[in-house]
From Swiss-Prot:
Required for the morphogenesis and for the elongation of the flagellar filament by facilitating polymerization of the flagellin monomers at the tip of growing filament. Forms a capping structure, which prevents flagellin subunits (transported through the central channel of the flagellum) from leaking out without polymerization at the distal end. Residues 376-416 form a coiled coil. This is Flagellar hook-associated protein 2. PANTHER family: FLAGELLAR CAP/ASSEMBLY PROTEIN FLID, FLAGELLAR HOOK-ASSOCIATED PROTEIN 2. One of its GO terms (cellular component) is extracellular region. InterPro entries: Flagellin_hook_IN_motif, FliD, FliD_C, FliD_N. Its main location: secreted.
């Protein structure tokens, strides 16, 4: 009956617990074997997880490489990187030229000369003024700044900065007075250049100014950057960056001086791809070798894994024909030859064979990855079936154990009853013997 409890040796007639343990140990051997098999599969799946990541990395590397874009990539070499920096797009022509930086851009900085006696001094009156900022000689933006009699210089600075982003206000201390300082936030915001006498400037304060402001004094002139390419006209920019001065070429001025510029085809993306491919290929091939070769290899003779190596090696023929790849004794590969020379001397052949390699490698990597994922799924299915078998066997074992307990308990009861009968018979025989002995007297 379900739920019944049986205890060994309750009557003392038969201690069947150890016998039951031995029987159950024998009956549980199939479960132990299944558990060992499941453990082995889990170990294989862990190893395959690491290998799968390498296959995925190789597959993504090949699929994400764009040969057309890489062949169009240009680079700019400069003779003096302290003078300029140059960025180029694929539209840039392959030319050389000189750049003369006449001057770099600078921001306009003004200080109002009256000043506050302390940071706690208040303005003492209510009013407002207008901050006007010229973005060009004819165009400007305006902002109204209101102030009250209890405002300090710090309050005015905060109001100016919170109202707009063209001018940065701050406090200038000359050792005696605290003064308002105004500076452009960026050279690129305005093409206005400051005149030494301030007859032309970008920053203006108009209206009723606090008497502590005074007159503005020039600290630094706003200047536009100027460069000359070769013997051409001087080019001017509000900031230090000159966009598309030549199609696809942008120049950033750093300081006055001259630098040579040479624009040429950039092979770095192709070289980087080939280096990464060789590294990834060698990692995959080396792991295939360790997984499938040797007496204790976990996947010895497993075709799914061995085919990964064979499939990838078949894709290398175009690269070997270009002289860019060579085999090493251990089955790995390395780069050989001069990439730049191959591309420059045989551009059409290089593009054709690289395309052939990429197409075949992409197809093989995809097939290998999918086959490998199927193999992992097969092992996972095996593990799930083992789990189900273990569950069923465990249930059956519990039932069999309960049956054996009941049978042993019944046997113990029977043996206890038999012992009791034997004792009674023994006592009965003793009594008869005693009776017979007494009669003989």
């Amino acid at each position: 009956m379900a739920g019944e409890l049986y205890f060994s040796g309750v009557t003392g007639a038969y201690d069947w617990g150890s016998v039951l343990d031995n029987i159950m140990a024998v009956k549980s051997i199939p479960i132990q074997k299944l558990q060992q098999k499941k453990q082995l599969i889990n170990q294989k799946l862990q190893i395959l997880g690491e290998f799968s990541q390498k296959l995925s990395d190789l597959k993504n590397l090949i699929e994400n490489f764009n040969l057309e874009s890489a062949l169009k990539t240009k680079k700019a070499d400069v003779s003096d990187s302290d003078v300029i920096s140059v960025s180029v797009s694929e539209n840039a022509p392959e030319i050389s030229f000189s750049v003369n930086v006449l001057n770099t851009a600078s921001k306009e900085i003004l200080v109002y000369d009256a000043g506050f006696n302390s940071l706690d001094e208040t303005i003492g009156s209510d009013g407002s003024f207008t901050l006007r900022y010229y973005t060009s000689p004819t165009d400007y933006v305006e902002y109204t700044i209101d102030y009250s009699l209890i405002d300090t210089l710090k309050d005015i600075v905060n109001k100016i900065n919170e109202t707009q982003d063209y001018v940065k206000a701050s406090i200038y201390y000359d050792g005696n007075k605290y003064k308002l300082m105004l500076a452009e936030t960026s050279e690129e915001n305005s093409t206005v250049e400051t005149a030494p006498d301030l007859s032309t400037k970008a920053i203006h304060l108009l209206g009723t100014l606090p008497h502590q402001f005074g007159n503005n004094v020039l600290i630094q002139q706003a200047k536009n950057a100027r460069i000359q390419i070769g013997s051409g006209d001087v080019i001017e920019s509000a900031g230090n960056t000159f966009e598309n001065v030549i199609e696809g070429v942008s120049i950033s001025a750093k300081r006055a001086g001259t630098s040579e510029v040479s624009i040429s085809q950039d092979f770095s993306k192709i070289r980087e791809f080939l280096n990464n491919f060789v590294k990834s290929y060698n990692e995959v091939v080396s792991q295939v070798k360790s997984l499938t070769l040797g007496e204790n290899a976990p996947f010895r003779g497993e075709n799914t894994i061995m085919n990964v190596k064979y499939g990838l090696s078949d894709t290398l023929t175009p690269l070997m024909e270009l002289g860019l790849i060579e085999y090493k004794e251990d089955g790995t590969i390395s780069l050989s030859g001069n990439l730049e020379s191959v591309i420059n001397e045989k551009p059409d052949e290089f593009k054709l064979k690289m395309t052939q390699f990429l197409e075949s490698a992409k197809a093989v990597a995809k097939v290998n990855y999918e086959a490998f994922e199927d193999f992992k799924e097969y092992l996972n299915d095996q593990a799930e079936r083992i789990d189900e078998n273990i569950r069923l066997l465990s249930q059956r074992l519990v039932q069999e154990e309960q049956i054996l307990k009941r049978q042993f308990a019944q046997l113990e009861d029977f043996m206890n009853y038999a012992n009791q009968i034997r004792e009674r018979l023994k006592q009965f025989m003793v009594s008869i013997s005693e009776m017979n002995g007494g009669n003989n007297k």
